[in-house]
Structures are given as C-alpha cells and as structure tokens.
Design a protein with these regions (language model features):
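Predominantly soluble domains enriched in secretory-pathway, periplasmic, or organellar proteins
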Residues: 11-337
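Bacterial N-terminal signal peptides
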Residues: 1-11
Length: 337
C-alpha cells in the first residue's frame, strides 16, 4: 500500500526547464459563441472548431478560414475525420443526431440518428469505425464510414465525456458520472473493463501515449490521473489548473497539456519515463480557453476562446463563463525554436 501511495504522488522537479510557448495567431471565428471541441487533422492540415450550429474549418498553418459545415440547430460538439472515406463527422447534441460531411466541399452528406446528448466523436483506425459518445444517454453509437450507417450501439450507463482510440483495437472512454475509464474492444463493440479513478471528479479531457501505454485523464477537481492503458492502474496523480476540458500529448517533446478554461492556463507535464511525471510551469492563455487540439508534428497548440463579458456571473446551471457576443477566436500557440 505504501508503495502504491508513493507512486500516486506528483513528481515536482524545479530544475526541469519549462517550455516556452507564445501566441502567434488569433483567428476571429465570430458567432455562434457557444463552442466545444477543437480537432486538428494532420492529413489536411485543417483545424475543425465546433461552435453553435456549425463547424468552422481553419487552415492550421495560415489561419485562413477555408470552410463551414452547417447548419445544425441541435448544437455541434465533436468532430472526427476519416480521410480514406473523404468524410468528417459531427453531431447535434441537443437533437441526439449526428451527420457526415464531405472533407473537400464541407457539404453535409447524411444525417444519422445517435442518442441524447451526442457529444465527443472519435475514429478508430483499427476497426475503421466512428464512435459517437452519447453523453446524456450513456451510450455509444458506432458508425461504419464505408456505408455511412450505424452498425451497433454500446450501452455503458452514466454520463460520458471524451474518448480516444488506443493500441490493439481498444477505445477508452471517460465515464464522468462514475469516475471511471471504460475500455472497449472495437472489434466486438463490447466493454472489456471499467477502471475506477476515484479521486478524479468528472473525468473530462483524455489523451494517450500508445508507446508508453499511458492514458492521461483530466479532472474537474484540478487533478490529472495517469492510467496504465493495459491494466487500468493509476500510476500518478498530477496537479492541473481549474476547468480542464481537454488534454493533448506531444510525443516528440514527451509533454502533455491540459487546457484550463476557468483560470486561463495550460498545465504542462513532462513524461520522463512511464512511471515518472514532472509538473512544469503553466502557460498563460486566457480565461475561457478550455478546449484544445495539437499538431503533433510541429507542437503547435490550437485553443478556442472568447472575450469575457464584464460584470456577468457564470451560468448557475452549466457553470459557463459568459462571453462577449461575436468574440470567439482560435488561438495558435507555438513552442520556442
């Protein structure tokens, strides 16, 4: 027990040099102002930002807006890209639906039935299936991009958040309601395991380092759990900022990042080896910057944020920080050369 407790403590090493990142572009996106996931597609170099009734597509190098996918009255949340099928996927969370769209023209091709609270979406390259997390329904809709049709529904129960594909045909899903990570076999669409993360309040952000078999789970109580993706064991618990809604991993620099919208920071953690993690100096961003994508080839980070509405308290029900209408933007942050 003592050894396990020691392994779960954060490793703080002041001698470790924190990386320098700076904002190099601010791309105005404008209304709608209610936004969610930010996804970078390495094949096209495009950044997809879900906000309101549309998805805005931005060139990840120049910052030019190259297209829009719309219109979705049920509000968009997640995005997945399937290059081989020339299709992208997004959802209408409040309507319990999803849709496919053409990656070149951005025209909607087909509307698909999902379930209540359709939210995060991811593509698993092993099964070649798209997985839609129906957050409020506690289920996952499985789509075959070849036929653009649902092929299965996985009933999980409990509110779900983000998901990532893993090694050997596994899908890992944050179970926000039950403080757990769910492991799913994407060949059979069956649940393999429920792994508890008891000190993680409402798991939200999720990323993976397949090489070290590590999952990185961000929590609303200012913690990040490092979880073994093969056994489900919690390897370490690290401090992060307030309001994390996304985690990304940079395999070249062996760094993981948590975007924290409530205090306007990015927490930075170095992976020294699969058992040793070091909390570094956070990057200052702006309050509301809570979702994030990464270009793993260059290390560039992409964050959606908006200007805060002065003298307006957060929404009592959702906790969202009120923002100024039409002020949504996409921030580009680059590491120092």
């Amino acid at each position: 027990m003592a050894a396990l407790a020691a392994a779960a403590l954060p490793c703080l090493a002041p001698a470790q040099t924190a990386p320098e990142y700076s904002v190099v572009k601010k791309v105005p996106l404008g209304a709608p102002d209610r936004w969610d996931y930010v996804v970078f597609d390495s094949a096209s170099g495009h950044v997809f930002v879900a906000h309101g009734d549309e998805v805005t597509v931005v060139d990840g190098t120049s910052g030019d807006i190259v297209g829009h996918v719309k219109s979705f009255p049920g509000v968009t949340h997640g995005i997945a890209v399937v290059t081989a099928s020339n299709r992208g996927y997004t959802d209408e969370g409040e309507a319990g639906k999803a849709a496919s769209f053409n990656l070149k023209t951005f025209a909607v091709e087909k509307h698909l039935q999902a379930a209540e609270g359709a939210d995060a979406i991811t593509f698993d390259p092993v099964s070649n299936h798209v997985f839609i997390m129906n957050g409020d329904a506690g289920s996952i809709t499985v789509i075959d991009p070849k036929t653009d049709a649902a092929v299965a529904t996985i009933n999980v129960s409990g509110k779900l958040e983000y998901a990532v594909p893993g090694e050997n045909g596994k899908l890992f899903v944050n179970g926000a309601a039950k403080r757990e990570v769910i492991s799913i076999d994407t060949a059979t669409n069956k649940i393999v395991a429920h792994w508890p993360v008891p000190d993680c309040e409402s798991p939200h952000g999720l990323a993976i380092n397949g090489a070290s078999h590590r999952l990185f789970v961000s929590c609303l109580n200012e913690k990040l759990n490092v979880v073994d993706s093969q056994s489900g064991q919690v390897i370490a618990t690290m401090p992060i900022g307030k309001g994390s809604d996304a985690v990304v991993f940079d395999p070249k620099r062996k760094l993981l990042f948590s975007s924290n919208g409530k205090d306007g920071t990015i927490s930075v953690i170095a992976e020294k080896d699969p058992k040793t993690y070091v909390a570094l100096k956070p990057i200052q961003t702006t309050i509301s910057a809570r979702t994030m994508g990464i270009n793993q080839a260059t290390g560039r980070l992409f964050l959606a944020a908006a200007d805060i509405a002065a003298n307006t308290p957060p929404d009592r029900k959702s906790g969202r920080i009120p923002t100024q209408p039409g002020s949504l933007k996409l921030l580009f942050l680059d590491p120092a050369p």
